[in-house]
From Swiss-Prot:
This is Malate dehydrogenase. It comes from Bradyrhizobium diazoefficiens (strain JCM 10833 / BCRC 13528 / IAM 13628 / NBRC 14792 / USDA 110). The active site is at residue 176. GO terms for molecular function: L-malate dehydrogenase (NAD+) activity. CDD domains: LDH-like_MDH (cd01339).
Length: 322
């Protein structure tokens, strides 16, 4: 049986890590695309040469033409300018919006049936623009944000409680930025809600607040440490979890930047919420009850995303007609 074709649009740090993980998990054959000549070809060859050692048979190719995306089953988009120290995700807006228009046109022409995962920042606005530019169904275009933000939250909690990350569940909703909403109420350790763990004396509310704040600034913390780029291992692993759920119809519930058309009181926007990802794409939006401070924080986050989308509309008004 022929292996699925997975196209990686952007061959930087995340793209290279994605390509290697796809081989290790044997999810399919890989096409690495980039506008920089030689870069995708070199990385594809390097990773392919690791296959005899790691024991996988995926086929790797590098390309500088969108034609290479032809009939890809999954497209993962990392193309764009990465964050640098002192730079917010929003600073990237005008530059990466142009990139999304080009990428969307390429996907529309060569991979119109693909499941598309966007990683490019500012995420929520870029996935909105990518869907507009590609014209693909909303359920087939999604943004990778919540899986990563939730993974950071889970890691910090596991470290705080000195337990396995496997026993920690956590959800982060809203936009992928400073206004994201880590939900303490719906986060657990071995099924025990975090508020109960505070009552049990495992931690304090003040400490939980610190962890929530660190989660919100998780990306910036790594940018400031690296000084020359942004995170790539955890973002790549997060996107692979989404791609695997689609390719293998696992129907995992994953927090993702998904299109909302009335859910959570939001219309015509991509915002981070829990969704079921299966072979049809985003098969269901999981609408959990938000109240009090959580609702206020979510609405504030939606407002921030709306501001970015409005900015996109001003910069590229032609997207609205698509």
């Amino acid at each position: 049986m022929a292996r699925d074709k997975i196209a990686l649009i952007g061959s930087g740090q995340i793209g290279g890590t994605l390509a290697h993980l796809i081989g290790l998990k044997e999810l399919g054959d890989v096409v690495m695309f980039d506008i920089a000549e030689g870069v995708p070809q070199g990385k594809a060859l390097d990773i392919a040469q690791s296959s005899p050692v790691d024991g996988f048979d995926a086929h790797y190719t590098g390309a500088n033409s969108y034609e290479a995306l032809d009939n890809a089953k999954v497209c993962i988009v990392t193309a764009g300018v990465p964050r640098k120290p002192g730079m917010s995700r929003d600073d990237l807006l005008s530059i990466n919006l142009k990139v999304m228009e080009q990428v969307g046109a390429g996907i529309k022409k060569y991979a119109p049936d693909a499941f598309v995962i966007c990683i490019t920042n500012p995420l929520d606005a870029m996935v909105w623009a990518l869907q507009k530019a590609s014209g693909l169904p909303h359920k087939k275009v999604v943004g990778m944000a919540g899986v990563l933000d939730s993974a950071r939250f889970r890691y910090f909690l596991a470290d705080e409680f000195n337990v396995s990350v496997e026993d920690v569940t956590a959800f982060v909703l809203g936009g992928h930025g400073d206004t994201m909403v880590p939900l303490v109420k719906y986060s657990t350790v071995a099924g025990i809600p975090l508020p109960d763990l505070v009552k049990m004396g495992w931690t304090s509310q003040a400490r939980l607040d610190e962890i929530v704040d660190r989660t919100r600034n998780g990306g910036a913390e790594i940018v400031n440490l690296l000084k020359t780029g942004s995170a790539f291992y955890a973002p790549a692993a997060s996107a692979i979890a989404m791609a695997e759920s689609y390719l293998r119809d696992k129907k995992r519930v994953l927090p993702s930047a998904a299109y909302l058309n009335g859910e959570y009181g939001v219309k015509d926007m991509y915002v981070g919420v829990p969704v079921v990802i299966g072979s049809k794409g985003v098969e269901r939006v999981v609408e959990i009850e938000l109240a009090g401070k959580d609702r206020e924080a979510f609405d504030k986050s939606v407002g921030a995303v709306q501001g970015l989308v409005d900015a996109c509309k001003k910069i590229a008004p032609d997207l609205l007609g698509r």
